[in-house]
């Protein structure tokens, strides 16, 4: 990817060229820490070794028995589902199989999906490192029962991605299900380029080897300077802006295929960096749609955010027909991609004119290699930010607290966090 930082120098808040050059000394130290973590395959840092350690042949072999499915169900939550959804939404087409993500426990949504797909032609990928995730296991039980009631042998339609032990691993062994391992030391939000994200991508027909090639190319280009490494440029600059008051980061791709990428980024950024009353709140937006709504706030609201605009340099062609309608002749003969790029440039200029810090990110195209590199580089950017901020990037204690409280509310008396629910103050208005 290419990162353009030029507009942050005169922004409010902003970063000077000298400031970035001074920060680059700390980036070099962060790079050394990251490289040491990679060499030792330390927890968290192990995610950056996935281009070398993931076995795409094993993944292809595991999914080979599922011939021509009509639908795929991803049953997971958070990083156990969002990475796969990002890959499918960016690179998948509208042909079968259709992919459905069951990453919530809304009964209306789950019921609607199960009633709309042919379960006998559906592949179920259940993803949970621990094998005990309440939402994932609940949805799995619901899908399994639906298949059984429909006369479908669910064991013929299920592939499991899980840890080396736990309920799901035991189930896979007892039912002889195909099962792939979640790599050790790789947090869920960093697992898109592992079995966690690649199983469904392979089922969908995406060239997962090309994704890994792109990520490997990005890994090979890491160096100890933000002026030579786009990932460090992004991570260091967003960190510097956050320390100066830009506590919100708006991720705004100008490509609908990257809309779920913005959602993936939001989890990565929030869960990794939101520690010790610090962090940068990620917001998902989509160009050009949200420039007709959210842009009002971004341009004219408080100067407490950085806007990340991202686009591919190459797009498919779709010509706008000529028209004799009054005032629209300028559109005729142009291209939808050209219009979207004009919207991108106009939005960037609008923000710069209002002194809003804006970072431009460009990739060659939305293809497997470019996407693999993009995902890898944003993971590196996040880790770089965490190193500079001295936060434990790879933990998620607040998330774990909520999980324990939910289990306590459902009757598991081992989790006392549920008591806080009853103790909270209320003021009801009806």
UniProtKB/Swiss-Prot annotation:
Q: Which SUPFAM superfamilies match?
A: SIS domain
Q: Which residues form the active site?
A: 271, 292, 303, 403
Gene Ontology MF terms: carbohydrate derivative binding; glucose-6-phosphate isomerase activity; monosaccharide binding
Glycoprotein listed as a keyword: no
Q: Which cysteines are joined by disulfide bonds?
A: none
Q: What does this protein do?
A: Catalyzes the reversible isomerization of glucose-6-phosphate to fructose-6-phosphate.
This one is known as Probable glucose-6-phosphate isomerase
């Amino acid at each position: 990817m290419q990162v353009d930082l030029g507009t942050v120098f005169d922004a409010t808040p902003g970063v000077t060229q000298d400031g970035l050059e001074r920060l680059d000394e700390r980036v070099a130290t962060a790079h050394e820490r990251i490289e040491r973590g990679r060499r030792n395959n330390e927890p968290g840092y192990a995610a950056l070794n996935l281009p070398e350690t993931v076995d795409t042949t094993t993944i292809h072999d595991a999914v080979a028995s599922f011939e021509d499915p009509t639908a795929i169900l991803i049953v997971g939550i958070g990083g156990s589902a969002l990475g796969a959804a990002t890959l499918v939404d960016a690179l998948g087409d509208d042909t079968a199989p259709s992919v459905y993500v069951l990453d919530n426990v809304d009964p209306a949504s789950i019921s609607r999906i199960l009633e709309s797909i042919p379960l006998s032609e559906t592949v179920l990928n259940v993803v949970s490192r621990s094998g005990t995730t309440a939402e994932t296991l609940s949805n799995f039980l619901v899908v399994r029962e639906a298949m059984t009631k429909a006369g479908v042998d669910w064991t013929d339609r299920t592939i499991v991605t899980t840890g080396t032990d736990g309920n799901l691993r035991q189930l896979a062994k007892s039912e002889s299900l195909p099962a792939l391992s979640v790599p050790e030391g790789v947090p869920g939000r960093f697992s898109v380029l592992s079995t966690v994200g690649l199983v469904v991508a392979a089922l969908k027909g995406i060239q997962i080897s090309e994704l890994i090639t792109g990520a490997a190319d990005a890994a090979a280009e890491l160096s100890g300077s933000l002026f030579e490494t786009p990932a460090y440029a992004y991570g260091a600059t967003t960190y510097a802006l956050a320390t100066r008051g830009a506590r919100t980061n708006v991720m705004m791709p100008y490509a609908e295929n990257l809309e779920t990428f913005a959602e993936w980024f939001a989890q990565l950024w929030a869960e990794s960096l939101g520690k010790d009353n610090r962090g940068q709140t990620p917001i998902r937006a989509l160009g050009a749609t949200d420039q007709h709504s959210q842009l009002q706030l971004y341009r004219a609201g408080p100067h407490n955010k950085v806007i990340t605009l991202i686009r591919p340099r190459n797009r498919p062609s779709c010509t706008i027909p000529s028209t004799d309608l009054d005032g629209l002749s300028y559109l005729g003969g142009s291209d939808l991609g050209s219009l979207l790029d004009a919207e991108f440039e106009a939005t960037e200029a609008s923000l710069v004119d209002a002194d809003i810090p804006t970072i431009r990110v460009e990739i060659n195209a939305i293809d497997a290699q470019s996407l693999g590199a993009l995902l890898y580089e944003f993971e590196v950017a996040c880790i770089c930010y965490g190193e500079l901020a001295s936060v434990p990037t790879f933990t998620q204690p607040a998330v774990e607290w909520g999980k324990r409280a939910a289990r306590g509310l459902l009757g598991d008396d081992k989790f006392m966090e549920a008591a806080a629910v009853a103790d909270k103050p209320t003021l009801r208005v009806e």
